[in-house]
């Protein structure tokens, strides 16, 4: 039987991805934080903004399209029970905060922009326990190269 990822059954591949994620979390956050990792998550995927981030003069002058994906781990129990927006983190407020940062003052490094987003999200929304931010540029123009995406992905945990 062939065991490559291309021939692996989707359910088996999904279990492998989940296991890999938990092993990653154990490495980054320590095993004790796996017990406290909330199982609820809000997802914002494919947020698109125009910004002027990067180290090249062309990036600073012409700007470019940036894509942001965000996962927010928090307890959604109260929000589910109340069906009240005040008991969760608003997608609209999250979008506005990310837009302000990405369309704001230019940064040299994508890592810095991702960290700015994660830090401000944790500061602004106390309900968030863990955040994942993926920030980058689709189809960047590199000399003699074709690349689908360049970026940085960060995980941050609230310090209680």
Swiss-Prot record:
Signal peptide: none annotated. Pathway: Cofactor biosynthesis; tetrahydrofolate biosynthesis; 2-amino-4-hydroxy-6-hydroxymethyl-7,8-dihydropteridine diphosphate from 7,8-dihydroneopterin triphosphate: step 3/4. It comes from the Eukaryota. Keywords: Folate biosynthesis, Lyase. InterPro entries: Dihydroneopterin_aldolase, FolB_dom, GTP-CH-I_C/QueF. It is an enzyme of class 4 (lyase). CDD domains: DHNA_DHNTPE. Substrate binds at residues 59, 91, 110-111. It catalyses: 7,8-dihydroneopterin = 6-hydroxymethyl-7,8-dihydropterin + glycolaldehyde. GO terms for molecular function: dihydroneopterin aldolase activity. The keyword Repeat does not apply. Expressed at very low levels in siliques. The active site is at 137 (proton donor/acceptor). Its EC number is 4.1.2.25. The keyword Transport does not apply. One of its GO terms (biological process) is tetrahydrofolate biosynthetic process. Belongs to the DHNA family. Homooctamer. Forms a hollow cylinder assembled from two ring-shaped tetramers. Catalyzes the conversion of 7,8-dihydroneopterin into 6-hydroxymethyl-7,8-dihydropterin, a biosynthetic precursor of the vitamin tetrahydrofolate. Can use L-threo-dihydroneopterin and D-erythro-dihydroneopterin as substrates for the formation of 6-hydroxymethyldihydropterin, but it can also catalyze the epimerization of carbon 2' of dihydroneopterin and dihydromonapterin. This is Probable dihydroneopterin aldolase 3.
